[in-house]
Amino acid sequence: MQKGMEVGIFTFWTSKDNYGQTLQCFALKYFLNHQNGMNAEVIRYYATKLPLIVRIKNAVKRILLYICPSINRSQYENIKSLEERNFAKFKKYHIKYSSSTSYGKIELNKVSGKYDALITGSDQVWSMLLDNPDNSVYYLDFGNKKQKRISYAASFGLQVYPSNIIGELHNQLSRLDYISVREEDGVDICNKAGVNSVHVLDPTFLLDKKIYEKLLKSPPAISYTFMYVLNIQDGDDIDWNNLRKEIATSLIIGTNGSGYTSSQVILDGIVYENSTIEKWLTNIAYADMIVTTSFHGVVFSIIFEKEFVFIPLKGRHAPSNNRVLSLLNKLDLTDRVLFENRTFKQIEKNKVDYEKVNHKLDRFRSKSIRFLMDSLIAK
């Protein structure tokens, strides 16, 4: 093992309300640094830099909203919700970032030379299609030739890659020394691009549950169901009127996902919270039941060994179901999916056998860790 190895993690990192994005950054950094003695950090990168005049206008607009919220109530509520979530505090204390921010590939080349290895992923970094040449950075086309280039649990966010750019995908993937993807669909796409890849776990699974338990806060005093529902417009998208009748607890706590504010009450009868990272984890860890449309909502339900129900999305967001179904299929948990031929009550009656799940998960985790560590220490 190469203690002190310098590793640059290249992934999505800017969100102020995406719990999964932030926790996968935390998990990969923690695994490499605290459990394996490396010096890994998330590379701060933007494709472009906003002109100074635009940044000044945005700052003035923010000040005016505080002085007079009625100017734009929805924008004001959005700012307030982000402050309540307070991702900045979690990132400051729990995630290491590069000391400088790179704007564009030229600056990225200047600062990335210090790393012994570069890792792209996790998250849907390869959903950034290669018909835009700027997106090749997610295939690590920067730095120097001596650096190891690894993808860890990278996701395409697609079942089928556009055929007109599959040749360019081959070129970009061929640059990488070691390739792993988060979904089985990703393995298929890599095969069609003419490269081999390994199916691995999301980095949040690399850590023991005890690591996350150290982040937990005091739980609510009474029993509750936790709802973490993304990418719906109204209750009809998940048949909420009928679903609400089947949920046993009187208290339902909900956290809106990216793009929603506290003023947007999507589902009646829910107590909404703009949770911090720690409170979001707490709400999952102590819930009687988790109901979610989210990949990381499912992930942390499994990590904390909770009863959960996954509701597949419909319409234009339906492709995002694939990453969840890939994971559930691997762990023999597809009976937790609220398909149209099942009811919530039917799923609720069948308790998750976490002894069997953890046996499968441990083997998959060992395979994932072996891939990552072998890739990093290979000569």
PLM ranges: what are they?
Residues M1-K379:
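Active-site anion-handling motifs in enzyme catalytic cores
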